[in-house]
Amino acid sequence: MSTDSKRYCIKTKHVAIICAAVVAVGLIVGLSVGLTRSCDSKDGGQGTTQSPSHLPPTSSPPQDQGVCPASEDESGNWRDFRLPDFINPVHYDLQVKPLLEQDTYTGTVNISINVTSPTQHLWLHLRETRITQLPVLWRPSGEQVQVRRCFEYKKQEYVVVEAEEELAPNSGEGLYHLTMEFAGWLNGSLVGFYRTTYVEKGQIKSIAATDHEPTDARKSFPCFDEPNKKATYTISIIHPKEYKALSNMPVEKEESVDDIWTQTTFQKSVPMSTYLVCFAVHQFDSVTRTSRSGKPLTIYVQPEQKHTAEYAANITKSVFDYFEDYFAMEYSLPKLDKIAIPDFGTGAMENWGLITYRETNLLYDPNESASSNQQRVAAVVAHELVHQWFGNIVTMEWWEDLWLNEGFASFFEFLGVDHAEKEWQMRDQILLEDVLPVQEDDSLISSHPIVVTVSTPAEITSVFDGISYSKGASILRMLEDWITPEKFQKGCQEYLKKFEFKNAKTSDFWEALEEASNLPVKEVMDTWTNQMGYPVLNVEDMRIISQKRFLLDPNANSSEPHSVFGYTWNIPVRWTNDNESTITIYNRSETGGITLNSSNPNGNAFLKINPDHIGFYRVNYEVSTWEWIATNLSLNHKDFSTADRASLIDDAFALARAQLLNYKEALNLTKYLKMEDEYLPWQRVISAVTYIISMFEDDKELYPMIEKYFRDQVKPIADSLGWNDNGDHLTKLLRASVLGFACKMGDSNALNNASHLFEQWLTGTVSLPVNLRLLVYRYGMQNSGNETSWNYTLKQYQETSLAQEKEKLLYGLASVKNVALLSRYLDLLKDPNVIKSQDVFTVIRYISYNSYGKTMAWNWIQLNWEYLVNRYTLNDRNLGRIVTIAEPFNTELQLWQMESFFKRYPEAGAGEKPREQVLETVKNNIEWLKQNRDTIRDWFFN
């Protein structure tokens, strides 16, 4: 599926002042929000075609208390979070009937169960859906067992079935059979089985589909909802005749039930985990390709958007064929479908044989979409294809090893796209997308290991984060480099063969790679998966290196929380000298560091440690070496690879932020930028310096100096590329980045161009160049937006059908420098007919990027927290993560407000880690400003 150790005290006399200030701020915000709501909300979106949706249900489905009432009975092992290992499903016969207009569905499931120990109770997962008839239970002999009662144990999301007598273990081939009838809602949520709507030729149409990962299959139907409870499925859907049904497997038969209903039954599936079960009822059109091995690869899409599925269809075929070759294993099912869901909570979901997508990640229109959209589609398509092997064929034993799914998909997606789009430099772009961003996350005390214990649905949901995905991908990249790509590939093939249709743990993967490489993979890699963080290597005399844990907070206790490895790592250190590249294993037991066996014994030539940032660590050279690097970048930056230029700058700014390097040395590296003309370094430079920019945004003395310096640095490349949307893929990405940075730094020429194009667009007669649209919407709105242009942009958002264009317009709307309009925009978040459920948190984040909206967005979250929890639930990871919009905060008052808010709502659900991380970050920001402002001011001043 496409993430705090210091204590801060406020002196007592300041508390009264702060309290008064907070009350005043709260009143002002509350009044402004209230006033603008009463004035503006009535005309939000008048006179436009509304994108339909539906509101959450006002109440839960009525409970049949006589069937399976809720109970606090804790007399059995259903008290435990995990299912017992002596009750295992073997096969599900599942029939579901959606009543689309009523927003409900009914169903029946018959589960064949293997019982290996005597028990009087069977329990399985169920949440929000209700049992409508007393369950029926049969022995392996076919004799019915009397059921005494059933009840829901809501604490662990179970339904418990109690038999009149003890069930003996079944022997031989015979199995118990449990039949349950159930009913549930199709509205109010983007998880489980749900309905959403879209417009076709002015008519509102419905589609119903499932989204089950990680623990939401239990919302659709009663099931043993753990990844190691694999079973086969025969699924049938009863649906209106004018609709079609899809599921994991091909259709076995379609039968008419009556004049209104058709029953579609699908072939029996291979053994799979509950979270991969999928079905959909739709009226879409399709585009099909055929794989080299003869498998149909079909994309289902709204009929009016059929042309936007062509690119995804082509990339699917190319990457699918590549992975069948690379993994030396044919795809396991007879077909592979993909479907674009109009309102979808995650980026995409790898359901076996029926992958579901958010529209932005599947549908690409070359005449309307940007190059970044095209790359996103390719990456997400490749990511979900990887899962058809890593995740579906071989599934992690338990969610603590989620990275075996997500880290692998995040790594191999770059190989897949690199195969299909060879000019995009995807093998290097992994630095921008995964390696360098997650190194920032993982340098906090509040990070977590890749392999982490989880024991609630909220904890499971919360590990779908940058550590599982991006750090997982990063260490696989390092591992592949160490043991060689050939042996890495062979090890992956052996792992897939050995655990086909089964579950595996991290240690199983290490074992497969050890057999393929004859190298101590487990000994090295356990230090990377079983403890959080990563090292910084300090280089002395150009050959002596020592390691220590890298933390952004220089005052943090680097031994906390406890790690069995003591925050030391076994490191495959790659280094180059005179164009020769070598790997030396730095054993963590060598506490005094190691000496590299360099052909340069005097240490007077540059020894590049970690070329192309292939290893998941940072490198700190002596000051004289950093000065040499800065000089040589200015003399001939092409002596360093594009990845090295990005890596050196990122390392330097991270080291300076952690007070391991003077900011003077880091900033000196940026002096060469007037000559830089490549995407990779520029994109990373912009990210690296954004921290400084955001910290000093409100500093009236320093910020203009920062703006002027970076404006001058970016001007040559911005002027050279200009505002014509031409060039290859990477040039288009580069242009969007540097022109955006020029606008952000207040370049009058860039801002005037953005405003001019924006004014032309407002006339309705000009189509903007696709790769400049986001820039124009953002900075045109920021520079010259008013109520008229804002209303026009909102109208365009509501009338356009392409999701990628909608997303850009949402960002434009969030960029207006007008508090009343931003307040009105925040009000629209509660109207799903205007802003889809999937986009609410995106909009809040966009508003927070606006200097006018930063505090407004945060205050809106606080004022509307209970509403958001009711709408999305505490288990929603997007809700959990939204608190991270406060990461740029850097005052004691802002910190106090955050801590007060978290105390008021202590239940964080999937937001537990994000809360820890944002508090740690804000505390670090406050301290950072005290420590670094003068140094940075002096550098820019001079």
Swiss-Prot record:
Active site: 384
Extracellular side: 36-942
Region (Disordered): 40-74
Transmembrane segments: 15-35
Keywords: Aminopeptidase, Calcium, Cell membrane, Disulfide bond, Glycoprotein, Hydrolase, Membrane, Metal-binding, Metalloprotease, Protease, Signal-anchor, Transmembrane, Transmembrane helix, Zinc
GO biological-process terms attached to the record: cell migration; cell population proliferation; peptide catabolic process; proteolysis; regulation of blood pressure; regulation of systemic arterial blood pressure by renin-angiotensin
Name of the molecule in the record: Glutamyl aminopeptidase
Lineage summary: Eukaryota, Metazoa, Chordata, Craniata, Vertebrata
Gene: ENPEP
